[in-house]
Amino acid sequence: MTTSSPRTTTLRPQTDAEYDVWLAAIIPTYAADKVASGVWSADDAVEKSRQEYATLLPQGRQTPGHHHYAIIGADGQPVGSLWIAEAQRPGKRVAYVYDVTIAPDHRRQGHALRAFQALEGEVARLGLAGIALHVFGHNTAAQALYAKLGFQPTNINLYKAVPPAA
């Protein structure tokens, strides 16, 4: 467990029950994000999402190299979740953030910021060199948070729709 602020947000491993609730919620959420970003059609997005998660987490919460945390608020109650995987980058191993979710009634209270600050301690404890992540282009709130935390863009994909020829 790592503390990160006087307001105290900590991370602890998710329980099996917390993992099951998280997985059931994240599959349709990820599908909706892929549809909103124009990558998938709505018709089969949930099934594609389910398949991606099955591929990424073949042993569920016990998949080697993956770490699933509950984000715990100052009152000791879970306020969200955080999933990282150990990943190889040129010359170093890093924590790749696959998901961070704060429960709707706990958003805009600094929990995500403090969870990432706590994650830095976990990353150091795991012997990893840094933190990498992906953020959807339409998620401007997350982009602002990551900039505040000192993340720098490494790749940017852009898209422009072109109307059909007349």
Map each language-model feature to its residues.
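Conserved beta-strand-loop-alpha-helix junction that forms the acyl-donor binding cleft
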Residues: 107, 132-142, 159-165
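Conserved active-site tyrosine of GNAT-family acetyltransferases
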Residues: 146, 151
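Acetyl-CoA-dependent GNAT
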Residues: 9, 13-103, 116, 122, ...
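Actinobacteria-biased recognition of intrinsically disordered, low-complexity terminal regions
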Residues: 1-8, 166
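Short acidic/polar active-site loop segments enriched in Thr and Asp
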Residues: 129, 152
